[in-house]
């Protein structure tokens, strides 16, 4: 509470005590309101930051990589909080974590090298990958060939010696080897939309 009172006073908030009670209840930290910040978990500290942002009841809330560094349980709780806040205001979420988008967003904008590569409904983005996502079981030799021609989403060993299970992307209507179609995900659609390259070269890409 002391931190929020301090920040509220600095920002010219009138009657900060009443508003602070509202926001700490809204973000779910009422029971810990009188504890020291240094005792909070990463997720709790994120909630305090959101509470600070809500002090003046803004119509738009911009959050950047809000779940980075959180454990899975904290991440789920924080996503639910963002979804709740989105019912009353516009929440702009900037993140590289695909699960954050599918769990909290209805629309997405994908930036590639500072330019908009896609903007629209999540469902439209995912549907654009329909018929382009496949699964196959290949030998190590075949894997090298597939990898050179297609984007590999994942590869993992199987219980059968000499076989590798792969999920890959292709813009061909039918791969030239035995494969099964797979229901696309937002990650698949993203990888089809953005040309693949060295992972270090892709750090500038973002999803909002």
Please provide the spans of the model-predicted regions.
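Conserved catalytic motifs of ABC-family nucleotide-binding domains
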Residues: 57
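Short loop immediately C-terminal to the Walker-B catalytic DE motif
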Residues: 67-68, 98
């Amino acid at each position: 509470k002391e931190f929020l009172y301090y920040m509220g006073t600095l920002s010219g908030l009138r009657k900060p005590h009443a508003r602070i009670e509202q926001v700490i209840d809204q973000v779910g930290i009422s029971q810990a309101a009188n504890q020291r910040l240094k005792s909070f978990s990463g997720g709790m500290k994120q909630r305090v930051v959101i509470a600070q942002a809500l002090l003046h009841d803004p119509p738009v809330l911009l959050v950047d990589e809000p779940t980075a560094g959180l454990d899975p349980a904290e991440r789920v709780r924080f996503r639910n909080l963002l979804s709740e806040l989105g019912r009353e205001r516009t929440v702009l979420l900037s993140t590289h974590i695909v699960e954050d988008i599918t769990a909290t967003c209805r629309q997405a904008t994908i930036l590639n090298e500072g330019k908009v590569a896609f903007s629209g409904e999540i469902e439209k983005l995912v549907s654009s990958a329909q018929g382009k996502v496949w699964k196959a079981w290949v030998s190590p030799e075949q894997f090298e060939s597939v990898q050179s021609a297609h984007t590999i989403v994942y590869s993992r060993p199987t219980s059968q010696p000499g076989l590798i299970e792969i999920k890959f992307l292709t813009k061909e209507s039918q791969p030239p080897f035995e494969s099964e179609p797979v229901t696309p995900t937002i990650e698949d659609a993203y990888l089809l939309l953005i040309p693949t390259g060295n992972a270090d070269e892709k750090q500038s890409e973002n999803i909002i």
